[in-house]
Amino acid sequence: MKKKFKKETIAAKAGIASDQQYGAIVPPLYLTTNFIYDELGKDQLYEYTRQGNPTRDHLIAALSDLEGGIGGEILSSGMAAVSLVANILELKSKVILPHDCYGGTFRLFSSLAEKGMLEVHFINQAEESFLSQTISQINPDLIWLESPSNPLLQAVDIRKISEKAKTCSAIVAVDNTFMSPCFQNPLSLGADIVMHSTTKYINGHSDVIGGAVITSDEAILTKLKFWANNLGITGSPFDSYLTLRGLRTLGIRMEKHEKNAQAIVEILSNNAKVKSVFYPGLAHHPSHEIAKKQQSGFGGMLSFELKEGLTGVKKFIEKIELLPFAGSLGGFESLIGHPYTQSHGVHTPEKKEEIGISDGLVRISAGLENTDDLIDGIQSALN
């Protein structure tokens, strides 16, 4: 029986010493657009890079191994990954999404619903009635989960929802971007699909846009491969090469991201100017017990609300020096964000109020800097 290695080893060894031509330790970068046919009329593994490429295959093999899947596709962006999942559905399929889902996901599925292509329902999946009543009432074809959510870090019980989904033959897809394969594996909890914006933690260096979709189901895998090629949204070999290089240090990076996040949470929790702190590692966080049960870590993302609201946010952004104000997350550098105008800016003010995102909310992606430097920088900006 082949030995199953730990995640750090899987990431570090992905594709290593696989070059049979020259014996290179690091797998080569195949920048070619096409491949020579062996003979007329004979199918072969690689024909055209949109359809398949060895560099891209090394990356998806590593991610599939880390997530416990059988395969998947590397895409040109996180939203391309979301689009791919949407495209494997039949016309008029019913889809349930979180009421507080990422703005890009909300915009995509809302647009498809407006065109009459899908029937879409945005629902608070943390409510008890979601499991006991809503799923059965809607009888969905796809349930899309974001656990933990952006930016309030709300977790939902992936295992329970997956079990309920099976009663109506629904596919369960989980956006696992915030946790990475290091801290959560949705397929092992019963989900059918796991999706990542590899732009974030998996690449980890803020220099590549990418996405990934991994599955544990053969029929779904066939559809993913067909539609990724058909839509022309597969990732480039060079981006795959850089992402695989970033993936090799994922384990040790996630440890540091989490350590820094926990230190920041501690000082924010004791600051008089802070109204609330949102981090699943806090015992009083509403999703703490679920997160503790299905995650092996609490991650490097957190958010907090300032008592002064938007005025306080503006002051904080102006005064802080170490943390740039920018979109995205999961890179080596710590970043601050304003969900009200950035990730969830697509929503109306009323919708943002409904899902708990105020204009005084700040999101932090804890990077890899020295912990004391981060704390000093944040405290100075607040005080």
What are the residue ranges of the model-derived segments?
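Short amphipathic alpha-helical segments
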Residues: Q44, I209, T243-R248, F298-L302, ...
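Short, acidic Gly/Pro/Ser/Thr-rich loop/turn segments
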Residues: I36-E39, I220-L221, G309-G312, S343-H344, ...
